[in-house]
Each structure stands twice: as C-alpha cells, then as structure tokens.
Amino acid sequence: MNKINIKKVVLAYSGGLDTSIIVKWLQDTYRCEVVTFTADIGQGEEVELARTKAKAAGVKEVYIENLREEFVRDFVFPMFRANAIYEGEYLLGTSIARPLISKRLVEIAHQEDADAISHGATGKGNDQVRFELNAYALDADIQVIAPWREWDLSSRESLMDYAQKHGIEIDYKKQLKKSPYSMDANLLHISYEGGILEDPWAEPEEDMWRWTVSPENAPNKAEYVEITFKKGGIIAINGKTMSPASVMEDLNKRAGAHGIGRNDIVENRFVGMKSRGCYETPAGTVMLKAHRAMESLTLDQAAAHLKDELMPKYAEMVYNGFWFAPERKMLQAAIDNTQEIVNGIVRLKFYKGNVTVVGRQSKDSLFSEKIATFEDDEGAYNQKDAAGFIKLNALRLRLKALK
C-alpha cells in the first residue's frame, strides 16, 4: 500500500488500549487524518468515553452510533431464523457483529471521502478476515489497514510501553489489573479467550462469568416464560410487545439469572488453528430452543429437514465472514420463505441452567391431534395403509439382504 496516497482513514474504534494506540500509530506511520467510528451494539460499556478519548488523541471527526436495533433486527434475527450454530456449539455472537461494523466503516469512508478503513483485529484471528471480506463485498476497491499485520508490537506490555512513550492517556493501574481474558460483548453474547483458557484442560474461574449466575446458585424456583413469534422473529415476551433489541435485553437478564447460556468450546478458526473460547449467550440459547419448537409445530417435514441440512453451511458462511456473499443471501431468501408460517407462542421453563420447552401453539400448526392420537381416531388414519408404505421402503433393503 502506498502510504503517500493515504490522507484519511476511518478506524473502528473502541477506546481501549489497542485502538487508542492505533490512532497514534496511523497518524505517525501514514501521516494521515484519522476518523473514528464506535458502534454501540450492546457491549455494555460507556461508549461516549470513546468520544473523549478520541478527541484527546487529536481526532476531529468522531462517529458514535447506537446500532442496537439494526444489529438485532437485520443481523441477529435473520441468523436465528436459520437456527445457525457453528460446529454444533457456537451461536456466532462475535461473527454476526462484524458485518454491521464493516458496513458502517465503508459507508462512513464514502461519506468522509476517506482513502482507507482500519481495524484492531490481530493477524491470528478470524475477525481480520470477517472485517475485510465484508468490506470488500461492499466496496471492491476499499483499502484496508490492519496495524497488527504491520507493526512490531506483540504483547500488552509492548503496547503499554508504546502508549507511555507517545503520551497516550491510559490508566496503567487499570491495565495491570485488567482481566486476563480477551473479551468481546454485544447484545447476543460475551466471549472470553486467552489467559488460563489457552490450556483446554483448565476450568475457568467462576468469577470470569459476567452475565450468568452459576447453575448451582440459580434460584430453586423455576420461571415460566411465553415467547410470541411472527414470521420466525420474536415480537413479544409474556404478552408484552418488544423491539428486537429489547427482546435480547429481556431474555439476557431473565435467562442469565437462571444460569442459562454458558458454553466452553474448542472451535476451528477459519485461519486454520484451533481456539478455545468461553461464551455466555443467555438470550441466544433461549431463542434457538424456542424457535426450533415453533418450527416443529408449523414447518412441513421435508422443508424442516432440508433447512437443517443447509444450516451448517449457512453458519459457516457467517463464521467465516461471508455475510454479504451471494450464497448467504440466496440461502437467506429460501429460509425466510419458510418463516411465513412460523407464528405462535412457545412456553418455556427456566431452571438451574436449563431451558425446557413445555408448550407451543399456533394458528398455523400442522399438528393434528385427531390423527396423532393413540385413542380412536374415528377413521382419520387407516393403519392398514402402513403395510404398503413399509413394503415399498423395504424393497432395496430386501434386495441387499438376498445377496
């Protein structure tokens, strides 16, 4: 990349140690103006502090945007309509946040007539891939600066030394006492990596978990919750209509209080290595269970089974950074077509780390009590018909058995 041609850069900025250093590094290395962008997607931090820190670093244009509703409505909910889960365990909390941030980075770059965008993802992880693939899908000519792939800073200590040397304001005592884990949070989840988690045999300390109580210490009384779906999306909890972001906030609080949503995973990163992460996804755990329950009542068998076959590929696309790719959009269109009839109410029980479906109802239900009953069905189903069905399906098996 020709540094001479870089006059203005839009940086995805959190206000933390890494991105605070990146501001100064970009200014010194590229001799460019830096515009910062901070997305509020429910990370639970005081995002306005990012404005103060950016201004102190000499940033003139600071973008701080509340994207909570857009994040859930246009990214989280569509993903959950697919029942997406990566490698059978991961609910994609970090993965699904990256497309929206990339989208706004590109849009702000266009608005500011910037020459490049930049992010603080390391050269070892998935996020660098996600940020950049999503950005290139929206602007083929966008230039991306990834400082972690260029500079020689390789540890927290080296970052702190750089900050001290260049007069970057950070709370050194806070940094030294900082959690040993690398954390990332939004309305869908909070993740933990690093520290003792780098040993896959080591159990995380109880005080690591921030959103959920230990199931052992959860209430001894179960809580019943009714979730209302319309076209595959949650629109109400216990009869109270809520916005998408409010749904997430409510379920995170309710489910977290019962110890629901903890997960400890070793996953295969897109870049090739295995990585261990711990996740708290209270609302997502509930949503997946409830949505599958609603689909079990309303979706045709073959459509439901085909959807399940497509889901791992969909989840892989999200995980790897292909949200804006044509194949993900194609699958989304097919999935959303199935959701027109996913309407109704699911009743759940929360108790000591478990979420159990205890009831479901829908005006679009395909369940026929008259046909399914073990009692007299008054001729609704002729059991004699099953003989021919079995005989035809057994044909290839019988032919094989004759050999």
UniProtKB/Swiss-Prot annotation:
Its main location: cytoplasm. Keywords: Amino-acid biosynthesis, Arginine biosynthesis, ATP-binding, Cytoplasm, Ligase, Nucleotide-binding. One of its GO terms (molecular function) is ATP binding. Pathway: Amino-acid biosynthesis; L-arginine biosynthesis; L-arginine from L-ornithine and carbamoyl phosphate: step 2/3. L-citrulline binds at residues 90, 95, 126, 130, 182, 191, 267, 279. Pfam families: Arginosuc_syn_C, Arginosuc_synth. It catalyses: L-citrulline + L-aspartate + ATP = 2-(N(omega)-L-arginino)succinate + AMP + diphosphate + H(+). One of its GO terms (biological process) is L-arginine biosynthetic process. It is found in: Cytoplasm. Its EC number is 6.3.4.5. PROSITE patterns: ARGININOSUCCIN_SYN_1 (PS00564), ARGININOSUCCIN_SYN_2 (PS00565). GO terms for cellular component: cytoplasm. ATP binds at residues 12-20, 39, 120. L-aspartate binds at residues 122, 126-127. Coiled coil: none annotated. It is an enzyme of class 6 (ligase). NCBIfam families: argG (TIGR00032), PRK00509.1 (NF001770). Belongs to the argininosuccinate synthase family. Type 1 subfamily. Homotetramer. HAMAP family: Arg_succ_synth_type1. This is Argininosuccinate synthase. It comes from Ruthia magnifica subsp. Calyptogena magnifica. The gene is argG.
